[in-house]
């Protein structure tokens, strides 16, 4: 039976199909930051639970980081408490943290791809609605709430109901000064802010193929503004060229196997 990219990734990560039509899905990468993780770690402490797979976690200070005068530290008291909590929790559970003084620190949905933590075929979650950004690299990525952050920390799984498939094909050449941001705003205007509700959207077509990875990330990032849970795009040569030699990319054999799985053959 033919499968979409969404179908492929979902089926490969499905541990169990439940009687209520939900499924237990394995999560490959968990991105955490200071805003939605403190309560999740508190939940682990209360329930005396440990973390299932520390290596799957990428932790960074993100939402409360000042854009100027960083040498003065965090001045907002609430923001400071959240960042201190992230530091303490990462230290307690031996999770590597990309803190303010680390050159790898940055916006979570930017450094994931830049470091090669975001990889094709992965399931990726984060306590942030715009996690769909990572779908530009052929991953199934979506935001989760704090209770689910705790659940992934403890079990590496989530109980989910599968979305419906939604393909948006875009062809033609973008005019000068028209960007991917304009394109996704046009799409949202066309289908409405709830037009993608209950769907995962896959973007295809020559226009998408001609976009840079960064431009693709913009489209996937804003997919949730159309009400969809996630947006994703197929793996191609641009994806390969963007990811090659990234620090956390897996060994060549593993990656080559993934490429065969994800690549499309056009006849």
Language-model-detected regions and their locations in the chain:
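Accessory "access/gating" subregions that flank catalytic or transport cores
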Residues: 107-116, 226-265
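Conserved small/polar residues in nucleotide/adenosyl-binding loops
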Residues: 129, 265-267
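Conserved short loop/turn motifs at secondary-structure junctions
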Residues: 27-29, 73-76, 204-209
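Structural motif
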Residues: 23-24, 55-58, 94-98, 122-124, ...
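Mobile "lid/hinge" segments at catalytic clefts and subdomain interfaces of large enzymes
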Residues: 130-131, 135-244, 249
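Generic structural signal for well-ordered, non-membrane alpha-helical segments
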Residues: 2, 6, 33-41, 75-86, ...
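N-terminal amphipathic, basic-rich helices that act as targeting or association modules
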Residues: 1-54, 213-215
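Long, structured ligand/cofactor-binding scaffold of large enzymes
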Residues: 33-35, 39-148
């Amino acid at each position: 039976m033919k499968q979409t990219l969404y179908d492929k990734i979902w089926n490969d990560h499905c541990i169990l199909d439940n009687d209520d039509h939900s499924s237990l899905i394995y999560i490959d990468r968990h991105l955490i930051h200071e805003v939605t993780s403190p309560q999740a770690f508190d939940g682990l402490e209360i329930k005396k639970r440990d973390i299932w797979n520390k290596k799957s976690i990428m932790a960074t200070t993100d939402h409360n980081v000042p854009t100027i005068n960083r040498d003065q530290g965090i001045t907002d008291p609430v923001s400071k408490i959240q960042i201190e909590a992230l530091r303490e929790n990462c230290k307690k559970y031996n999770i590597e943290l990309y803190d303010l003084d680390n050159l790898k620190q940055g916006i979570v949905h930017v450094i994931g791809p830049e470091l090669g933590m975001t990889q094709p075929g992965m399931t990726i979650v984060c306590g942030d609605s715009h996690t769909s950004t990572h779908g530009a690299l052929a991953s199934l990525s979506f935001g989760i709430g704090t209770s689910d952050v705790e659940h992934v920390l403890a079990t590496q799984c989530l109980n989910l109901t599968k979305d419906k498939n939604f393909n948006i094909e875009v062809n033609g050449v973008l005019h000068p000064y028209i960007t991917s941001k304009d394109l996704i705003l046009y799409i949202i205007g066309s289908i409405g802010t709830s037009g993608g509700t209950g769907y995962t959207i896959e973007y295809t077509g020559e226009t998408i193929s001609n976009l840079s990875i960064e431009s693709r990330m913009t489209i996937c990032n804003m997919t949730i503004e159309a009400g969809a849970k996630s947006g994703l795009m197929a793996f191609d040569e641009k994806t390969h060229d963007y990811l090659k030699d990234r620090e956390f990319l897996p060994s060549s054999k593993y990656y080559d196997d993934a490429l065969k799985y994800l690549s499309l053959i056009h006849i």
